[in-house]
């Protein structure tokens, strides 16, 4: 049996490493459902077992009463699906069948989970010995005094999502938005209470970060109502599991659906809309939606859905609602297909509050440069737009991937807060508050670099001639050292019979 594990910050990596061995020849896109399914099964079983034991201790014989669990938003787990049974069968050849049957029985007992859980653990290509080892890992999670399985397994689910995004590369955009981008949206919008909506919700990251924000500020998760929609059926299922693990009661519709053609929340007016819709989406069905009520500011072009997504979100905005969304940089300046006119009309309606140009290489899935749009139906600074140029922010965490630091995120959010308070001073090269007359002069193009200018470089006070003499002297010394090293290398190679011509 696997050794007892302490559920500290490194536990997510331990689970990932062990589970990665389990993968074998399966590709990441298929395999993620196996790993995430196991995490989910362990989570709901832990919550059920805790409540079950509580009811046993009360001594009224109510431990098998389903209503006792559903009243507290706990999924009812039938006997054959409880983790203790899974653990007992961990190293039997039929462990895959046992887990599949557990998933089926949980779906039968819980209407909300019907058709959502993965049932593919019995497949021949899944190594059953390694599957048992991963079950052991979960079985032996040892909580610390302040431990909480919901938090630990939630963190693990989130970590594995990010690792799958890394493994899948260009396909990852369907289900995963980098957490630093989501955090930036959330820290700016501050969704403490009200209706939160994401029309392209992927695996539910916007909602998870909103819940974390509320927890950090001692709020109550029940102060927000969560609404989402997702087109991809497997991603929709992942979102349902992700939110359930976090204890977030969400309405993602009864099924996956196309946001443009089957709006599952047609009457919703949200207080906060947050989204990272597909960039520059082509073939989105514009020809069938020419007279749609959502296109208040102009009909979006058939070859690019950027302004269809933006107008869909505006349509669902409450009278005091705010939007925070990720779009490709082309949305800031494009004039093709009537996009310039749509952008102009949205600006004239005084809905745009802030535009942030983001650094490159933030996504696993694309190198397309992106920006953040923030809109507000009740702007505190009417007739003005805040521009932030954050392109120089972030640190490279791998050769190909950049992340915003906590300090970066808080600087962007703090700049926005100061703007709302009316105390923000322009910072050349980083931020500027601009009146609509200036935006009009720029033909309603919203690229932040046009407005914030170039940061002033600090004058070091060293005359140019002296500086060049100093630098060339240093370079000369470096050249001399390189020649010495070259001679030494030649000498050492010659001593063992090799020469460089």
How would you name each of these model-derived features?
Residues 269-270, 294, 304-306, 320-322, ...:
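Active-site lining segments that contact anionic ligands and/or coordinate catalytic metals
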Residues 25, 284-304, 330-339, 359-364, ...:
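Short, contiguous acidic/charged loop-to-helix segments that flank catalytic cores in large enzymes
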Residues 124, 146, 200, 228-232, ...:
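Hydrophobic alpha-helical scaffolding
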Residues 14, 21, 30-31, 35-43, ...:
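Conserved Class I SAM-dependent methyltransferase catalytic core
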Residues 171-275, 280-296, 307-308, 327-330, ...:
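Conserved S-adenosyl-L-methionine
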Residues 262-265, 280-283, 333-336, 364-367, ...:
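Switch/connector loops and helix/strand junctions flanking conserved nucleotide-binding motifs
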Residues 1-192, 251-264, 357-360, 382-398, ...:
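Non-catalytic, mostly N-terminal accessory regions of nucleic-acid modification and defense proteins
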Residues 351-352, 362-365, 369-414:
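C-terminal, active-site-flanking charged/polar segments
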């Amino acid at each position: 049996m696997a050794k007892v594990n302490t559920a500290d910050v490194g536990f997510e990596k331990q689970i990932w490493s062990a589970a990665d061995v389990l993968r074998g020849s399966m590709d990441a896109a298929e395999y993620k459902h196996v790993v995430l399914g196991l995490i989910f099964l362990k989570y709901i079983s832990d919550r059920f077992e805790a409540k079950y034991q509580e009811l046993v201790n009360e001594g009224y014989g109510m431990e098998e009463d389903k209503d006792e669990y559903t009243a507290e938003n706990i999924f009812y787990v039938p006997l054959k699906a409880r983790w203790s049974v899974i653990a007992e069968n961990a190293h039997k050849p039929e462990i895959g069948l046992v887990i599949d049957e557990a998933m089926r029985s949980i779906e039968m007992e819980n209407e909300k989970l019907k058709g959502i859980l993965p049932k593919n653990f019995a497949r021949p290509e899944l190594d059953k010995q390694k599957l048992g080892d991963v079950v052991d890992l979960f079985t032996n999670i040892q909580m610390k005094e302040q431990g909480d399985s919901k938090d630990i397994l939630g963190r693990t689910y989130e970590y594995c999502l990010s690792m799958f995004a890394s493994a899948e590369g260009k396909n990852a955009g369907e289900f995963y938005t980098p957490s630093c981008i989501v955090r930036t949206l959330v820290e700016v919008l501050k969704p403490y209470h009200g209706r939160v909506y994401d029309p392209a919700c992927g695996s539910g990251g916007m909602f998870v970060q909103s819940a974390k924000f509320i927890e950090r500020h001692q709020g109550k998760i029940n102060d927000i109502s969560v609404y989402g929609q997702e087109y991809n059926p497997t991603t929709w299922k992942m979102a349902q599991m992700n939110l359930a693990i976090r204890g977030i009661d969400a309405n993602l519709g009864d099924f996956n659906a196309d946001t443009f053609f089957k709006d599952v929340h047609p009457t919703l007016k949200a207080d906060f809309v947050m989204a990272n819709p597909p960039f520059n989406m082509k073939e989105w069905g514009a020809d069938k939606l020419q007279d749609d009520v959502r296109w208040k500011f102009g009909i979006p072009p058939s070859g690019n859905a950027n302004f269809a997504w933006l107008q869909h979100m505006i349509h669902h905005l409450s009278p005091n609602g705010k939007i925070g969304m990720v779009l490709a940089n082309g949305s800031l300046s494009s004039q093709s297909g009537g996009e310039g006119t749509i952008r102009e009309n949205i600006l004239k309606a005084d809905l745009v509050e802030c535009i942030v140009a983001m650094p490159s290489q933030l996504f696993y899935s694309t190198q397309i440069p992106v920006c953040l749009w923030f809109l507000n139906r009740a702007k505190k600074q009417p007739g003005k737009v805040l521009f932030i140029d954050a392109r120089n922010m972030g640190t490279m965490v791998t050769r190909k991937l950049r992340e915003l630091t906590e300090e970066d995120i808080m600087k962007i959010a703090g700049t926005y807060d100061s703007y709302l308070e009316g105390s923000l001073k322009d910072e050349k090269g980083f931020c500027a508050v601009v009146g609509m007359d200036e935006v009009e002069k720029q033909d309603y193009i919203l690229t932040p670099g046009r407005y914030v200018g170039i940061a002033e470089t600090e004058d070091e006070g060293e005359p140019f001639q002296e500086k060049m003499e100093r630098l060339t002297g240093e370079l000369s010394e470096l050249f001399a050292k390189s020649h010495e090293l070259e001679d030494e290398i030649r000498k050492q190679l010659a001593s063992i019979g090799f020469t460089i011509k």
